[in-house]
Amino acid sequence: MMRKWLKKNRLEKGFTQEEVAKAAQIGRAYYTMIENGTRKPSVIVSKKIGEKLGFDWTIFFEDVCNETKHNSKDSA
């Protein structure tokens, strides 16, 4: 499942995929796979992405990491 919330968050903060990938110490292609939902990041990578983009990294490991739940936090 594509993580549209992740892309939206990155774009709102004004970062490129390359910048986030560099902060997470991974390649841009791997970050793209995380953003597209084809790869799940490790705990270490999740923490670095969360730190760079300013969100709780544990969202990557929730049973249902869906956009409705994430977006409900934005609209509250």
Swiss-Prot record:
One of its GO terms (molecular function) is DNA binding. The keyword Transcription regulation applies. Residues 6-60 form the HTH cro/C1-type domain. Pfam families: HTH_3. Residues 17-36 bind DNA. InterPro entries: Cro/C1-type_HTH, Lambda_DNA-bd_dom_sf. It comes from the Bacteria. The keyword Transcription applies. Keywords: DNA-binding, Transcription, Transcription regulation. This is Uncharacterized HTH-type transcriptional regulator YqaF. It comes from Bacillus subtilis (strain 168).
